[in-house]
Amino acid sequence: MSKEKVLFVNQEIMPYIPESEMSKAGLDLPKGIQERGYEVRTFMPKYGCINERRNQLHEVIRLSGMNLIIDDTDHPLIIKVATLQPARMQVYFIYNEDYFQRNPGKGLETEELPELNDERCIFFVRGTIETVKKLRWEASIVHCQGWLSALTPLYVKKVYADDPSFRGSKVVYS
């Protein structure tokens, strides 16, 4: 019997973002689900305040390189990955310099530059979904955490409803 697959679309995950209720839940939920034998994929934005060297992020060339059109403008999608130890849980980071590198080290872009939050949200959700499709990974459950993932249920249930990666997926939002 194959493992159930759970996709986590997180706004924040500790230790990449300083400890808060949301970043702690972003770590504990996927980790706990993985420990129970589920196959887990976790995604979050690659904010400018995340130190790539300290957190050992590296670009996944085979997943990067596509462009997402938002408001009639092409935006390159860069995928980075890191592994949380000791759980050995991979975290995929959705990155684009226009949306997630504006204020490195000065706080989250969603707070520092809120005028771009609508486009930032669309880019993050579409980037996550397109990456999951490219992985050819079929999620049984999609768990969305935080307002930045709020469009995920709409995309999964309407736009990508017939796509094999999401056909039949259950969606949870917290």
Model-identified regions with their sequence ranges:
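A short, Lys/Arg-enriched amphipathic alpha-helix followed by its capping loop at the start of a domain
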Residues: D28-Y38
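A short acidic (Asp/Glu
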Residues: P18, E52-N55, L151-K157
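Conserved nucleotide-sugar donor-interacting segment of glycosyltransferase catalytic cores
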Residues: N117-S174
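Hydrophobic anchor at the start of a short beta-strand
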Residues: Y38-V40, V91, A139, V171
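Short, highly selective alpha-helical patches that border small-molecule cofactor pockets
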Residues: M22-G26, P30, P153
